[in-house]
C-alpha cells in the first residue's frame, strides 16, 4: 500500500462562524452539503453518499474552530491519517478562512482535491456565497 500524503486547501467564505459551526459540526448541517445523510452515534459519524457509506471517528470538535475525524477503515488498517475542517476570521479582511486538511495516496491526490472543490462549491451554495 502506498503511503498517504497530507495536503491542505484554503477557502474564503463570506459567512459567520456561527453559521459555519452548524454546517461543519452538526449532522443536519453536514447533510446539507457534505453527504446525503449523516448519522452520529457516540463519537462515530456515518456518512452516506450515492448508496455507499463511510464511517469516521471524531477526534476533535470545538465550536468556533472546527472539527477533525479519522476514517474508521484507515484506523483499522493502522494508517495514521485524519481529515479536518478548521476555520478562523482573517484579522485584516474579517472574512472566514476555511482550511481543509486531508490525506491521499499520491496517485489519488488530484481526484481527492477535485472532490473537495466540489464539496466546497456545495457549501458555498448552502451559505449563499
Model-inferred region functions:
Residues 8-14, 46-48, 57, 86-88:
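Generic structural detector for well-ordered beta-strands
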Residues 28-75:
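Glycine-rich portal/gate segments that line the openings of hydrophobic small-molecule binding cavities
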Residues 20-21, 30, 45, 58, ...:
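Hydrophobic pocket/interface hotspot
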Residues 6-8, 52-56, 78-84:
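Short, surface-exposed coil-to-beta transition loops
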Residues 17-18, 59-64, 87-96:
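A short, structured loop/turn motif at beta-sheet edges
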Amino acid at each position: 500500500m502506498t503511503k498517504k500524503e497530507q495536503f491542505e486547501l484554503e477557502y474564503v467564505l463570506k459567512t459567520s462562524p456561527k453559521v459555519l459551526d452548524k454546517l461543519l459540526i452538526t449532522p443536519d448541517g453536514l447533510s446539507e452539503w457534505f453527504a446525503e445523510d449523516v448519522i452520529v452515534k457516540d463519537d462515530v459519524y456515518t456518512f452516506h453518499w450515492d448508496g455507499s457509506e463511510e464511517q469516521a471517528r471524531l477526534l476533535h470538535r470545538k465550536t468556533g474552530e472546527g472539527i477533525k475525524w479519522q476514517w474508521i477503515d484507515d484506523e483499522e488498517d493502522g494508517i495514521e491519517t485524519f481529515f479536518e475542517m478548521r476555520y478562523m476570521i482573517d484579522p485584516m479582511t474579517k472574512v472566514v478562512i476555511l482550511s481543509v486538511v486531508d490525506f491521499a495516496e499520491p496517485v489519488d491526490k488530484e481526484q481527492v482535491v477535485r472532490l473537495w472543490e466540489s464539496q466546497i462549491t456545495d457549501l458555498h451554495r448552502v451559505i449563499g456565497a
